């Protein structure tokens, strides 16, 4: 297992959940957190603890977004019309690294971030190497021609463990994806339950 995989699965162990639904997650074999004290029985969490855990889980899912970035996204979500929790999910799903992952151009969120940073992705025909780039409805995302035969791309196409959600229209022959609409929480194919309303409560304290 690579260092990147170890870091990724450490999030699973800390949460005690297989948050990406990966078959190789160590949580499939044990139900305690990382480290020598991971097997200690956990007590009941306080309301604050439950809210914090919900925030850590969602941050971890989106490739461990920094607190500064995550809070900035939350603030933007509160300024939009509608439910702040739903808005938060919509903004996270508009991140370019999320769309690349959802489109099955790569196998993990972490790989999506690296793939973009290395210049393998175009948006509307122009190279974009910023993983936090905000995709708009109607944008077309594509893998660069020279990158389409990379092993990481070919492997991701074969993954049976997840499907492309219906708010992204993908052509894997051309390696293109069109972002069709901003999803609601219920549209997003999370492997575990996400609770953005608890994150709103956390930041509203």
From Swiss-Prot:
Region (Disordered): 18-46
Keyword terms, alphabetized: Ribonucleoprotein, Ribosomal protein, RNA-binding, rRNA-binding
One GO cellular component term noted in the UniProt record for this chain: small ribosomal subunit
Top-level taxon of origin: Bacteria
GO terms (BP aspect): ribosomal small subunit biogenesis; translation
Domain S4 RNA-binding: from-to ranges: 94-157
Classification via InterPro entries: Ribosomal_uS4, Ribosomal_uS4_bac-type, Ribosomal_uS4_CS, Ribosomal_uS4_N, S4_RNA-bd, S4_RNA-bd_sf
Annotated GO MF terms: rRNA binding; structural constituent of ribosome
Subunit (UniProt): Part of the 30S ribosomal subunit. Contacts protein S5. The interaction surface between S4 and S5 is involved in control of translational fidelity.
Family the UniProt entry places it in: Belongs to the universal ribosomal protein uS4 family.
Protein task: One of the primary rRNA binding proteins, it binds directly to 16S rRNA where it nucleates assembly of the body of the 30S subunit.
Protein name: Small ribosomal subunit protein uS4
Organism field: Rhodopseudomonas palustris (strain BisB5)
């Amino acid at each position: 297992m690579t260092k990147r995989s170890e870091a990724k699965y450490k999030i699973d162990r800390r949460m005690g959940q297989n948050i990406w639904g990966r078959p190789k997650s160590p949580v499939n074999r044990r139900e305690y957190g990382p480290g020598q004290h991971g097997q200690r029985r956990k007590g009941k969490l306080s309301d604050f603890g439950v809210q914090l855990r919900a925030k850590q889980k969602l941050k971890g899912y989106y490739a461990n977004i920094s607190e500064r970035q995550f809070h900035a996204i939350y603030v933007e979500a509160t300024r939009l019309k509608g439910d702040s929790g739903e808005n938060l999910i919509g903004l996270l799903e508009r991140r370019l690294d999320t769309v690349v992952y959802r489109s099955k151009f790569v196998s993990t969120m972490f790989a999506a971030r690296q793939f973009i940073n290395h210049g393998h992705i175009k948006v509307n025909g122009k190279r974009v190497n910023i993983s936090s780039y905000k995709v708009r409805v109607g944008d077309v995302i594509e893998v660069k021609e020279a990158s389409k035969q990379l092993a990481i791309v070919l492997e991701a196409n074969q993954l049976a463990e997840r499907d492309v959600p219906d708010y992204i229209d993908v052509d894997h022959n051309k390696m293109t994806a069109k972002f069709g609409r901003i999803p609601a929480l219920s549209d997003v194919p999370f492997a575990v339950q996400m609770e953005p309303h608890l994150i709103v409560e956390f930041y509203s304290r």
